[in-house]
């Protein structure tokens, strides 16, 4: 790994963050959502999404390894969200690094929401001290968001 840096996302680098979000979201949701729905998640659409999150008060951070941007994460008060690492850069510790960075930025005990079918993300969060709270947002018959909280 090269020189790693985590920067706040601004208008100067939001396109890079949106590209990571779009590519990683499409990959992580390919077995969960329809192909048509996945195709909607373009860099341009995700730029709008990230901008709206920033307008709501979220701080979004971009992780670079050397001269390449590889991952993003957001923090809004005590909620960690939008943790995405490019598929080809996964399993190199970037997700854990972003998660630990975000945990330090939280205003209280860190929590997050994860799709019940996203087992890779659930394992990452469990390895890093998060546990299910039992809170659930039902999205469809087979899909729910599950709340996890850092247990200290």
Spans of features found by a protein language model:
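A short beta-loop-alpha structural element at the N-terminal edge
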Residues: 4-19
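Conserved acetyl-CoA pyrophosphate-binding loop and the N-cap/start of the following alpha-helix
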Residues: 63, 89, 93-101
């Amino acid at each position: 790994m090269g020189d790693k840096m985590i920067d706040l996302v601004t208008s100067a680098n939001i396109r890079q963050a949106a590209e990571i979000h779009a590519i990683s979201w499409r990959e992580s949701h390919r077995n969960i959502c329809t192909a048509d729905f996945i195709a909607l998640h373009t860099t341009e659409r995700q730029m709008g999404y990230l901008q709206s999150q920033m307008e709501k008060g979220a701080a979004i951070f971009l992780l670079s390894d050397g001269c390449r941007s590889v991952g993003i994460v957001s923090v809004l008060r005590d909620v960690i969200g939008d943790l995405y690492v490019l598929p080809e850069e996964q399993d190199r510790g970037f997700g854990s690094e972003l998660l630990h960075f975000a945990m330090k930025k939280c205003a209280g005990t860190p929590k997050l929401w994860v799709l019940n079918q996203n087992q890779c993300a659930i394992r990452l969060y469990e390895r890093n001290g998060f546990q299910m709270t039992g809170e659930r947002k039902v999205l469809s018959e087979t899909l729910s968001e599950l709340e996890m909280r850092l247990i200290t």
